[in-house]
Amino acid sequence: MVRYCVRSLSERSHEVYGQQLHGQEQGHHDQEEQGLSPEQVEVYERTQGHSHYRRRHCSRRRLHRIHRQQHRSCKRRRRHSCRHRRKHRRGCRTRRRTCRRH
C-alpha cells in the first residue's frame, strides 16, 4: 500500500513539472490545490494514521499538565497571600472562593 501511494505521488509531481514547462500559471494553480486540498490530507492521514493518534495523545497530556499547573499556581498564591496578609483574613477567604470557581 505504501509503495502504491509513493508511486502516485511521484507521478503527480512529474505531471505538475510538465505543466510548469507548458504554462507556469497552471502549474502554480495545481500546486496550490495539491497543498490545500482536503482529499490529499485524508490520503496522508490514511497512509500515516499513527501521526493523527499521536496528536490526540499529546494534546490530552498537554491539557492535563496545563490544568495541573493552574491548580498549583492557585494554591501557591493562596498560601503566599495568607502568609503575607495574616491580619486581613477576610480578603484571603474571598480569594479562596474565586480560586475554587476556576
From Swiss-Prot:
Q: Where in the cell is it found?
A: Nucleus; Chromosome
Q: Name one GO cellular component term.
A: nucleosome
Q: Using the UniProt record, give the first listed, main subcellular location.
A: nucleus
Q: What residue ranges carry the coiled-coil annotation?
A: none
User: Is the Nucleus keyword given for this protein?
Assistant: yes
Tissue/organ expression: Testis.
Spell out the residue ranges making up region: Disordered.
15-41, 66-102
Q: Which GO terms describe its molecular function?
A: DNA binding
Q: Which Pfam families match?
A: Protamine_P2
Q: What does this protein do?
A: Protamines substitute for histones in the chromatin of sperm during the haploid phase of spermatogenesis. They compact sperm DNA into a highly condensed, stable and inactive complex.
The record, for PANTHER family, names:
PROTAMINE-2
Tell me, how does this one assemble?
Answer: Interacts with TDRP.
Identification of the protein by name: Protamine-2
Organism classification, top ranks? Eukaryota, Metazoa, Chordata, Craniata, Vertebrata
